[in-house]
Amino acid sequence: MAQAFVNSKIQPGKVVVFIKPTCPFCRKTQELLSQLPFKEGLLEFVDITATSDTNEIQDYLQQLTGARTVPRVFIGKECIGGCTDLESMHKRGELLTRLQQIGALK
């Protein structure tokens, strides 16, 4: 169930962030990404606490990415890590480049 749920969310050309709403790093990630000019429907925040499978989802994220912490940020099918990784990419100018490469920005 958790594996199918996660896999259904991760898609090429889209940015998906698995979050918990009470997590300060998740909120920071949401703030950063929400400031960028995404095309409609190509940025999705998935609240993993809204399901009864929160632990299973985190276990599968661990299998998939090497970490079960949130946020887990996927650009297309690739996990780039969490909040700190996203901020580093943004500071280096790599984030906008990657988002343009997958066609996610207006």
Curated annotation (Swiss-Prot):
Coiled coil: none annotated. InterPro entries: GLR_AS, GLRX1, Glutaredoxin, Glutaredoxin_euk/vir, Glutaredoxin_subgr, Thioredoxin-like_sf. The keyword Cytoplasm applies. Its main location: cytoplasm. Signal peptide: none annotated. Has a glutathione-disulfide oxidoreductase activity in the presence of NADPH and glutathione reductase. Reduces low molecular weight disulfides and proteins. This is Glutaredoxin-1. It comes from Sus scrofa.
